[in-house]
Amino acid sequence: MAATTFYAHTMPGVEDIAWLEIRERLPYARFVDKLFAKEKNGIVLFQYDGPIRPLLSLRATEDLFLVALSFDKITRGWKDLYQLTHLIAQKPDFRQAVDQLMQFQRENKQSGPPTYRIVRRVYGRYEYSPKDLERAIEKGIKARYPHWQLVEDNHARVEIWVNILGSRLICGLRLTDHTMSRRFKMARQIKTTIRPSVAAAMIHLTEPDENDVFLDPMCGSGTLLMERRMAGACRQLLGGALTPTHAHYANLNVLQMRKERPSSFTMFNLDGKTLPFADESINKVATNLPSGKYDMLARLYPAFFAEVARVLQPNGRAVILCSEYDLLKEVLRQQPRLTTLTGYSITTKKQWGRIYIIHRD
């Protein structure tokens, strides 16, 4: 089977972590490129010659697409649209991608009338407008698939996404729906809840193992705990929240997951400045540090990271998402047992932050 080119949408900045997961789960996948759609998405292009279904198990991605057409250098003029219409109507690559999508839908018992929807995202300055781009795509589809019906809702059988990023054009057919990015049903969410794909990326960076004693001491709605459960077995799963209300709802969210309830899961009402765990009793920590006034964070960070250094086992690992980079670096300089290995700048809910991997020496 010839390798097919796919692309994954991620939250901006998560694309490097998403590729690490793709490479681990799909050993024969080959990296093609990574792109950045302003502050909307990261994009990872890769080739893979296996069945499509295993792609749906990826966790650090928001959406997955079959690549139908790709141009490295467009003219930014009207010629682009004439060429796009022609290639949609005539090029075998587009037909092959549609056939693969239809086969995948049949295998998954998806059926329905041949409807389609166009999603266009344009970043840069061009002679044509986004609406002109949409009309060019529609013209090509009508020429090739005259029986297809254009619809405006989210229930089209075929979603054609066209991204123009500077001089790069990528046309993809969507394989997934909203359930990939909004995968958890929660009893209650709080405003600071991170997206599941970001939580999954953080969990991947912890290098999950069945012997883990895993802690999220500031678990919010419990998203990191839920993603750790999805990553496989662990010896103990521990969560903490500052208020009894948050602890209660995070506990409900984790326990209502469809997978068998873990006998080793415990939720604590705790303060991140004084963790109720023995020295060197935990080997993995992942958490999203709160944002807020600098004075409050300047009191929290030193005490919290002193506790992380205390409870982590030697060679343990902490994966921390925070927005106060300078404060974190200053505090870690005061903890000689903690070493920052690397970091990834990401954005979530229109706010930039950084995921740090911290090693306990």
Per-region residue spans from a language model:
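Core SAM-dependent methyltransferase catalytic element
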Residues: 44-48, 347-361
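Class I S-adenosylmethionine-dependent transferase superfamily signal
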Residues: 22, 228, 307-308
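S-adenosylmethionine
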Residues: 246, 256-257, 267-350
